[in-house]
A protein has these predicted regions:
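Non-catalytic cell-wall polysaccharide-engagement segments
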Residues: 32-43, 47, 51-153
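Secondary-structure boundary/capping residues
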Residues: 18-19, 149
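Short, functionally critical alpha-helical segments immediately adjacent to catalytic or ligand/cofactor-binding
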Residues: 1-17, 24, 45-46, 66-72, ...
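Short linear capping/connector segments at secondary-structure termini
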Residues: 22-30
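Short, solvent-exposed loop/turn and secondary-structure capping segments
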Residues: 19-22, 80-82
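Glycine-rich phosphate-binding loop at the start of an alpha helix
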Residues: 3, 18, 35, 39
């Protein structure tokens, strides 16, 4: 369900440990952690996700592109539409390197290692500094899968 997707995103973002549980401040105010109320964070996060999902349908891309765009920004949806219509780690990596990181000052392609199991599995954990999280949609997928397993126990 969509509630499960939002819960998986909250777990991916903050594990529910901060007031801005969906890390949605930046989309609202342009400043990280400026939302200090969990309900407002969820309202804003769901608003962004809903807009992304509508844009994904309009551009005929897969829904995981909309989830990845939650991390990268809505223009990622256009990028995927122009490059095959399906979110992949490879596409996310190219977008991170060529669009996100340079727009935030990383013009040298500097990377760092992100020690997270999904990241290590898909790409050795490499992320571009200031480039967002190329593994975001995959992490949400894994968390959604685990939630479904544990709900059956």
């Amino acid at each position: 369900t969509s509630v499960d997707l939002v819960l998986a995103m909250i777990y991916t973002e903050t594990k529910g440990k901060t007031d801005d549980v969906m890390q949605s401040s930046e989309s609202s105010t342009g400043v990280t952690n400026s939302i200090t109320d969990q309900k407002e964070s969820i309202r804003q996060g769901v608003r962004v996700l809903s807009d992304n999902l509508e844009a994904a349908v309009h551009h005929k891309v897969d829904p995981w592109t909309a989830v990845q765009a939650y991390n990268f920004g809505k223009t990622y949806i256009d990028y995927v539409a122009d490059n095959g219509g399906v979110n992949t780690v490879e596409l996310a990596n190219a977008y991170s390197k060529d669009v996100v990181a340079p727009s935030l000052g990383n013009t040298s392609g500097k990377t760092y290692t992100y020690y997270q199991p999904v990241a290590m599995y898909y790409g050795g954990g490499k992320l571009y500094t200031n480039g967002g999280n190329i593994y975001y949609a995959k992490e949400v997928q894994l968390n959604l899968f685990l939630m479904r397993i544990f709900s059956r126990l």
